[in-house]
Amino acid sequence: VEKRYLEEQQIIEDSFRLGVQIFESGFRPTFIVGLWRGGSAVGIYVQECLQTLGVQTDHIALRTSYPGLPDYQNMVETPERIRVHGTQYLIENLNIDDGLLIVDDVFSSGHNITAVINRLSTKLKRNMPEEVRIATLYQRTGYNRTTLKPDFCLHETSDWLVFPYELKGLSHEEIAANKPYVAPYLRS
């Protein structure tokens, strides 16, 4: 799999562009959920953008049990093992008439977002918002294993994306070549 290393500035700019895309669509979320890790950062920028454009939202990050690149294939093969953590606030506050926006950095297999929606639906029952939308910076083409698809997306790619904060699953050589600013800190 080809790895593509992303720069922080591009993620920031794309996150604001994603916020504008959501705003221009007419969708007005009342809750934004950023999926920890990458989706939480994107969610912060989207929330700030929407707030500046006059859309007030409640916002929170949720975490799934997906640990990253080394475990990707296991997650694809056994999606029922994905756990969703940190839903209590949403369970206590979401209602059927809320607009829920789920934000992630990359939409790949769709299993993580499916796990979040299933967990919320199970707990909220009739209070599950009727309007649930998905926003992501990237969609990995050909990897979706669900019936979901992003409602808002900026880029399609088949590359494995490596975000600026990611180190797990990278060799020392890859870090030295693609993240030279980090390499000196990792020498023991």
Where do the language-model regions lie?
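PRPP-associated nucleotide enzymes
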Residues: 1-188
